[in-house]
């Protein structure tokens, strides 16, 4: 088994421990079949500054916002007794106009004190009923419903229709995004990798969920692009961190929660905030000073600042390390670009020790290639690559939301060893590696076609 994703699905399934069947859960769980109404009179594709969908893809739905709030208010906490006995049953709209049912439990991405101050910002974890392989996360805020889930077809995105308020939402397959900005660049320096000492890193994330306290700051420019108030910026941050967790939990068993005083890091005036808004390098040192001063060095595990600089920069392997753990920033010119979470995931990957995996040298790939981990052709396609940003070397226009095997190894090494094991906390999930029976050994002549069956 070389993929930790397969095993984590077993953990997500632990909600149902002790339950004989899905029917038993349905008997005590309210449904949600009337929440969404297909709006065929609206175009599913809305032109944006840096985003297009394939023609004829996606669908637009009108949500019964009050009914959804009422339904989700009864969702049990994910690690409580009722999460296993009676998760809330939720219907999710699909890009083809149909719907799919999923179990839903409350899964906060804020520390308790912060959550008490912002009760209107709610986040949830999803697990499929009709499709048991479906996993993802959903947020409900004054900005509407935002959800990302992965099933057998890939990642689906549900978000408010741009410019149409919190009632109309579009849903589409992420593979139908066909155009990105094309000029985003990660400036993280890549020092030579020391020679490997031999052996292998951890094969999976095991039965442990690793939780890190994230101090997430916002420049005045970023806040202005997200409503201009602390409340509106906090809503955008919660949506972002929830989407980030959908990736990191599935890939490496890591979760991020916003620290108790995170709202102190949201600045609303670009003229008076402590940041040089258009200088990525300056932002790193400024953010380290700001987070240490306002949050306290002992009260967070990693820090990050969101800006309007069109690029990212982070200290490699900075998580948990005093003096450098908040030296990271991500920015983008188009504030509502759904690809923004890709870039934040990329920079946080650097904070855990992951390096660039692309092999291209043209466009923004030039000067940023890391010889020690250049496994992917051209711009690459995974999260630590440069998909869509290496003009002349692009193999596709947006990242696939998973890490290359080398990145998985680097991040898991960073989380279970140095430096990530020095902070954060762990939650036992009860997850176990699957045991597969493939039958007794067989010897067949070379070149013989065969079909392999296994169970477990």
Model-identified regions with their sequence ranges:
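Positively charged n-region of N-terminal signal peptides that target proteins for export
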Residues: 1-5
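Positively charged, low-complexity intrinsically disordered regions
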Residues: 6, 38, 171, 328-330
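Bacterial N-terminal signal peptides
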Residues: 7-18
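A residue-level detector for conformationally permissive "hinge/kink" positions
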Residues: 10-12, 89, 98-99, 118, ...
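Zymogen propeptides/activation segments of proteases
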Residues: 19-281, 429, 454
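Extracellular (secreted or membrane-anchored) zinc-dependent metallopeptidases
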Residues: 204-456
